[in-house]
């Protein structure tokens, strides 16, 4: 049976894990690392690189290297202007007000780009397991809205994965933490500060039940923002000194981003760090260099507002769960940004206890997703996960009011109905405007869909009975229906296009992703064949040089001719010329090999001081030329390595 893999699709890094027996295993990628940078690069020749190879070439190719694409997932272009101004690549407005990344004149959706990262994760798992992988559990920030969840699901589909479950990142972390503590009753807080998003979830664990009591967060707060304060500090100082804004030069901005990220990481273990960027830009007076020393205390001053911002959702989540700080038994830190000492200090000061160091903040979410995959396949028993919807759901009613049907932090799956009526006499239809958010007025919340119920019989206002039903599945994805009780006529909407993509667009992107995968496979096959040809040329020349005089001319000549043919074919880099040339040299080699190996055996025998010794006897026996065993003398010899 096919395995269900768990994928943590992160803003900065991604990770994949799978259940092996009763234990979750994090799978290292082709580069040998357990996490993969969520970076995609479009390089010359049409090749697409993902992960470390993409990140390594970012400085020289900043406008075609895509990072932090998760910040655009499921958002409108009009909501993403701040993020768009912070990245070196070009973000434009697409259909349905969706953000699109422009590469060589083509517009890519965030879902397509995320799918490329997911394809890398899928391939990593397939190489490790030795079988095709078609199903996955993918994690999202707990505070992702319906559009962002849909966009993530679509990215999975484009990557060729059936997304069995969308699971909240803090919930996944709690699963990983609590799998071996199922018998203990405890309340835990999961503080999850990743590269682009922040979540806090309060959970209750006991008897194998993982129940989310409340969740809160900020989908625009993460490690990128901590990098940004350093980038602004460095760029502002450089502008004061040189009157040049490095943020306007994509290559300089990319170097600043990498330097800021490195400095942030170093300041987690050092009291100060030096940023040294030679030749960061140039003017008519010559090259300019950026050299700056930053102390940890300076970084903490710059990031103070961000740290404070993260604590507000924590207070709200505790309040929504009806708990006080002292009720929390354990605090778990998730996400690479929780390595920042100031974050750890603030969390410890708030809860009055040291956070648990028992989980790896970079891997724990993927491990939890793999466990959920195991629950779905039946490999993991006695675990029940009860998650919640992060935001309230409602519809717009008379006066532009947001009337909530399902409150935030309601356990899912759930279903709720409420009856409404018309606002005018003889109203033939009603528009159902579906909203997600906590604000009292409709305009202040996120629209996740609209649909109409037609054919209402003419009657005075307030007479028709329109029943509106919200149905949220275990993925947190919403279906809304409206029924006229008098006629039984109904209309429903599964909020599919809330991410801005139609089914046709998703299908088209799936086909393109498959084509890219085929192209990648062909590229690898070509590289392998070129390497094989190169190795064959080297080995043939070496063998002819060493043992050519031991081979008769009639057998050596076909090898030399085939070698020349292979060299010419190798220069063309065309497989249809290299493959037959390789076949030809292999065939020519076969006929010459008997004399070649015989010569080689004699040379080795000579090296051991025993011409015609045991090696020759062994080779002769293989070739059928040796005499009976009576003529073979047993000798002791030392293998020369």
Swiss-Prot record:
Keyword Nucleotide-binding set for record: yes
InterPro entries listed in its UniProt record: ATPase_NBD, Chaperone_DnaK, Heat_shock_70_CS, HSP70_C_sf, HSP70_peptide-bd_sf, Hsp_70_fam
The keyword ATP-binding appears for this protein: yes
Gene3D superfamilies xref list: 1.20.1270.10, 3.30.420.40, Actin, Chain A, domain 4, Substrate Binding Domain Of DNAk, Chain A, domain 1
A Pfam family matched in the record: HSP70
Compositional bias (Acidic residues): 631-641
Spans annotated as Disordered: 596-641
Induction info: By stress conditions e.g. heat shock.
Gly residues biased stretches: 606-623
Modified residues (Phosphothreonine): 197
One Gene Ontology MF term: ATP binding
Keywords, ordered alphabetically: ATP-binding, Chaperone, Nucleotide-binding, Phosphoprotein, Stress response
HAMAP family: DnaK (MF_00332)
Function comment: Acts as a chaperone.
UniProt similarity note: Belongs to the heat shock protein 70 family.
Full protein name: Chaperone protein DnaK
Organism: Christiangramia forsetii (strain DSM 17595 / CGMCC 1.15422 / KT0803)
């Amino acid at each position: 049976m096919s395995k269900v893999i768990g994928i943590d699709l992160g803003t900065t890094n991604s990770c994949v894990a799978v259940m092996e027996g009763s234990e979750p295993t994090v799978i290292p990628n082709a580069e040998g690392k357990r996490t993969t940078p969520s970076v995609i690069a479009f390089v010359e020749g049409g090749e697409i690189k993902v992960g470390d190879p993409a990140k390594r070439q970012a400085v020289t190719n900043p406008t075609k290297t895509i990072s932090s694409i998760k910040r655009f997932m499921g958002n409108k272009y009009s909501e993403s202007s701040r993020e768009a101004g912070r990245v070196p690549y070009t973000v434009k407005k697409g259909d349905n007000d969706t953000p699109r990344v422009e590469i060589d004149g083509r517009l890519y959706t965030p879902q397509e780009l995320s799918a490329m990262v997911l394809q890398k994760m899928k391939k990593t798992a397939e190489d490790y397991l030795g079988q095709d992988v078609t199903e996955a559990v993918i994690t999202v920030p707990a505070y992702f809205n319906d559009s962002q969840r849909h966009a993530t699901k679509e990215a999975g589909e484009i990557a060729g994965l059936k997304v069995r479950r969308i699971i909240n990142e803090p919930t996944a972390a709690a699963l990983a933490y609590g799998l071996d503590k199922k018998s203990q009753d405890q309340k835990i807080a999961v503080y999850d500060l990743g590269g682009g998003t922040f979540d806090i979830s309060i959970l209750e664990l006991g008897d194998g039940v993982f129940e989310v009591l409340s969740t809160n967060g900020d989908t625009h707060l993460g490690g990128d923002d901590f990098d940004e304060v350093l980038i602004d500090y460095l760029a502002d100082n450089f502008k004061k000194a040189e009157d040049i804004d490095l943020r306007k030069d994509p290559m300089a901005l990319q170097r600043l981003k990498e330097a800021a990220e490195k400095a942030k990481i170093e300041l987690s273990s050092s009291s100060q760090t030096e940023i040294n960027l030679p030749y960061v830009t140039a003017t008519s007076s010559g090259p300019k260099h950026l050299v700056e020393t930053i102390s940890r205390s300076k970084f903490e001053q710059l990031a103070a507002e961000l740290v404070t911002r993260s604590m507000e959702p924590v207070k709200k989540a505790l309040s929504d769960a009806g708990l006080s700080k002292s009720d929390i038994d354990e605090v778990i830190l998730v996400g690479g940004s929780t390595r920042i000492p100031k974050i750890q200090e603030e969390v410890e000061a708030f809860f009055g206890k040291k956070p648990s160091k028992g989980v790896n903040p970079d891997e724990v979410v993927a491990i939890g997703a793999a466990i959920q995959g195991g629950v779905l396949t039946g490999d993991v028993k006695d675990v029940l996960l009860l998650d919640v919807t992060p935001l309230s759901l409602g519809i717009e009613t008379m006066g532009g009011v947001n009337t909530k049907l399902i409150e935030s932090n309601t356990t899912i799956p759930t279903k709720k109905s409420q009856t409404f009526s018309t606002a005018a006499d003889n109203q033939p239809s009603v528009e159902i405007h579906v909203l997600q958010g906590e604000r009292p007025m409709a305009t202040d919340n996120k629209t996740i869909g609209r649909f109409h119920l037609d054919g209402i019989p003419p009657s005075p206002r307030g007479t028709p009975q329109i029943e509106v039903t919200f149905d949220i599945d275990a993925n947190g994805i919403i279906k809304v229906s409206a029924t006229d009780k008098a006629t039984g006529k109904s209309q429903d909407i599964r909020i599919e296009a809330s991410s801005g993509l139609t089914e046709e667009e998703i299908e088209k992107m799936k086909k393109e992703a498959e084509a890219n995968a085929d192209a990648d496979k062909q590229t690898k096959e070509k590289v392998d064949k070129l390497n094989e040809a190169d190795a064959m040329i080297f080995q043939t020349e070496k063998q002819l040089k060493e043992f050519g005089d031991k081979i008769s001319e009639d057998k050596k000549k076909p090898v030399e001719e085939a070698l020349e043919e292979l060299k010419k074919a190798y220069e063309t880099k065309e497989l249809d010329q290299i493959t037959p040339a390789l076949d030809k040299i292999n065939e020519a080699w076969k006929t010459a090999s008997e004399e070649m190996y015989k010569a080689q055996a004699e040379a080795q025998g000579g090296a051991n001081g025993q011409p015609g010794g045991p090696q020759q006897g062994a080779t002769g026996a293989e070739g059928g030329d040796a005499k009976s065993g009576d003529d073979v003398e047993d000798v002791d010899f030392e293998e020369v390595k």
